[in-house]
């Protein structure tokens, strides 16, 4: 094994082992590991590995960080207005079962996530669940974990729901409607929704001990409707701008949006809310509270993870794994295709549980194209590229649900719980995520094969 690959594997493995074992220190561990990659890359200890500070800064997804900060600020004003409490009251008045309430909130988060970034979805829906759990005097952990996982799951339902979907659409030449039906066959939307429906039974099973029925005698009065309007405008603006391509995905001469557009949108509406609050209350107290409540723990952790994954990708480790897949095309028989398809799906689940699925998907897409071509030529089968493309998306998108650090939405959800005084361990998180993910992935795995082979 080359020295660079060995170094990358060792540092990467130690980093994630420590983050699992020392959960309170995850940001420090992530930043330290990121610094090691940058230091080694800057010193030129490996001739083929150049990874300086500027390279690391480019790997950080500032769009995501700005979006989290801006949305958290607006959400704080939203919570202070009393609207989440009122929404909780309305839900309780209509659905008296705790289990059904969690299911409805999870499905609601999933629906929004099909059109809005997963992290933003969690930050918008979670406060309602937290307010509800406070009313019922129960732990918000199951509800928030289910909301986070559900938002990750349904992000793959549409072209605009997740970055991995955008990458796939470019590689497979798909447009917005192709995620619903393509060439007369069901697209990823229906595969994802089928997985979501199956996962409902997992939520009901995990919540089976919550048998209480709840009733309310009065409803909360909302103090200010402006934060609610700003949050709705945030969602609407994110949806509308999602139809505008980024520079890398735009055609020559086509108008495109900047890479940090979503982050700027979220920060803009928070700024409007902050100005409105100062004018209305004639003091800075609420704005100071909003800035203080931004989850800097999550922001630092994500920044560190982005740099780490950038280093792993720069070292060529992910690409080497992809090359290995491309080299085992086999005979091109139906069984060979099935084995390759199975390998791509479940390998994607495994790796996306520990690393960000965006660089992984970007690396694997050209590999999938090569593998499809090799299999078709070897066995003479007419293999549709969407078989492996959609299989990759099923594995890469849903796999991030398994671990707390496998997806930004999970990290954001756990950050909100931490703010409420609830530290969620890896074991507790995975008691929900593993059965949920397996149910959704197996459903998608079977459906994609039946539809496209």
Regions found by a protein language model. Name each.
Residues 183-197, 263, 338-353, 384, ...:
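Hydrophobic alpha-helical transmembrane segments
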């Amino acid at each position: 094994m080359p020295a660079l690959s060995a170094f990358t594997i060792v540092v990467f493995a130690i980093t994630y082992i420590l983050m699992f074992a020392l959960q309170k220190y995850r940001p420090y561990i992530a930043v330290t590991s990121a610094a090691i990659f940058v230091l080694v890359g800057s010193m030129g200890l490996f001739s083929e590995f150049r990874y300086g500070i500027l390279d690391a800064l480019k790997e950080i997804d500032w769009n995501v960080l700005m979006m989290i900060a801006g949305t958290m600020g607006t959400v704080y004003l939203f919570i202070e207005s009393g609207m989440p409490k009122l929404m909780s009251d309305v839900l309780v008045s209509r659905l008296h079962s705790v289990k059904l309430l969690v299911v409805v909130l999870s499905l609601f988060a999933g629906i929004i996530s099909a059109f809005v970034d997963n992290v933003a979805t969690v930050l918008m829906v979670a406060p309602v669940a937290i307010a509800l759990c406070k009313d019922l005097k129960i732990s918000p952990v199951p509800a928030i974990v289910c909301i986070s996982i559900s938002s990750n799951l349904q992000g793959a339902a549409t072209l605009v729901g997740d970055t991995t979907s955008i990458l796939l659409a470019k590689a497979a030449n798909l447009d917005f409607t192709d995620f619903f039906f393509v060439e007369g066959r069901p697209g990823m939307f229906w595969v994802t929704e089928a997985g979501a429906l199956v996962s409902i039974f997992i939520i009901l099973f995990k919540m089976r001990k919550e048998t209480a029925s709840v009733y309310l005698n009065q409803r909360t009065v909302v103090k200010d409707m402006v934060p609610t309007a700003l949050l709705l405008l945030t969602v609407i603006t994110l949806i509308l701008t999602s139809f505008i391509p980024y520079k890398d995905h735009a055609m020559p001469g086509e108008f495109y949006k900047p890479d940090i557009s979503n982050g700027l949108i979220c920060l803009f509406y928070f700024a409007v809310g902050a100005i409105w609050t100062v004018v209305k209350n004639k003091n800075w107290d609420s704005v100071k509270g909003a800035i203080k409540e931004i989850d800097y723990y999550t922001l630092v952790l994500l920044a560190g993870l982005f740099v780490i994954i950038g280093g792993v990708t720069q070292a060529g480790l992910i690409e080497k794994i992809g090359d290995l897949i491309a080299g085992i095309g086999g005979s091109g028989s139906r069984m060979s295709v099935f084995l390759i398809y199975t390998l791509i799906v479940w390998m994607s689940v495994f790796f996306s549980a520990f690393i960000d699925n965006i660089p992984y998907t970007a690396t694997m897409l050209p590999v999938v194209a090569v593998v499809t071509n090799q299999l078709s030529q070897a066995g003479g089968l007419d293999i549709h590229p969407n078989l492996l493309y959609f299989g990759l998306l099923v594995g890469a998108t849903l796999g991030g649900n398994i671990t707390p650090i496998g997806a930004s939405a999970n990290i954001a959800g756990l950050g909100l719980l931490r703010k409420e005084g609830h530290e969620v361990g890896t074991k507790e998180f995975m008691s929900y995520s593993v059965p949920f993910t397996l149910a959704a992935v197996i459903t998608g795995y079977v459906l994609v094969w039946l539809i496209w082979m």
